[in-house]
Amino acid sequence: MGEDRGQGLTRPLFDRLAFQSTVVTPALFLAPMAGVTHSAFRRLLGDFGGHGAVFTEMVSASAFLKENADLSPFTKRRPIEGPVVIQFRMSDEDRVEAVIEKAAALAPLAIDLNLGCPAPKIQQQASGAALWRDFARLASVLRRIRSVYAGPLSVKVRLGDPTEDWRTPFLERLKLFEDAGVDVLTVHPRFSDEKLKRRARWELFPWIADQTRLPVLGNGDVTRPEDVSGHTEAFAPLAGLMLGRAAAVRPWLFRAFAGLPPVAIDHAEVWDRLWGYTLEDFPPERALRRMQEFTVYFAQNFTFGHQLYKAVQVARDVHDLRRIALAFLEAGPQLRRN
């Protein structure tokens, strides 16, 4: 048994943000994370609360048209999750209009376009960072989205390519977003080729916010409220905050940012609860992989967490995985100070 040891706040760091006529309170968002922010994890996050809205995993536009959106773990929803933003990766070769019309029928909080994913496989399909790079195709995709959808539209970006003049194409795209009717901009301040070990450039948030009339959400490397309160000059111009990897490590993390009281945490119970949720939403073989991915993050709560995540990677099936994980978690492993 442990506890939520975040210092917490007396009020949310970011009180509210309007997505057109819908106000999200607080303006704290779960980031889209491949393999993690599926329906089962979003349900677990909802159990703890503190967030304002959640993003789905990055959904393939072409695959989405073949899925039953009410059953797919990418897009199925439960009330406890709160407002949900559906994030897509797409190119101008996709059936953009059909994808957006199908997504709009689900009545999400917003539809989001991923323009930052640097994975080679994604870029080879002319989406993610590759779509950001191709101005004409990006403009075409945004125009086609808006031709069939008037609801809240957001985009998630990085800084672009690491050239000396990176600010010029960045500003050109900010202007494009405004002209195309984008409502909210999320910025992860790393360049397209940078891995996550490179520190996010929080110091760029004020400049970015000053260059656009769009509300800006900040994303990248924030793990505790003190990161924000200790860098007010960087975060004060933002309209909201997006948390990713840190929330996968500690699904209760949003409570501290929202000013909610800390709660006692039984790490074994939390892991086991997600195991059950995941089996409800995925077939066993896919649930195994999803829980292995989650455990890589969750193991970071412990001083010797590497023993946990290495052990679960060789599990034969979901039941073997559960046996291995609970043997570690129920033994009272030493907590690491996050």
Go through each PLM region and give its residues.
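N-terminal small/glycine-rich loop or linker at the start of catalytic domains
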Residues: T22-A27, S62-P83, C117, Q124-Q125, ...
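Hydrophobic faces of well-ordered beta-strands that scaffold small-molecule active sites
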Residues: L28-P32, V54-T56, V84-F88, I111-L113, ...
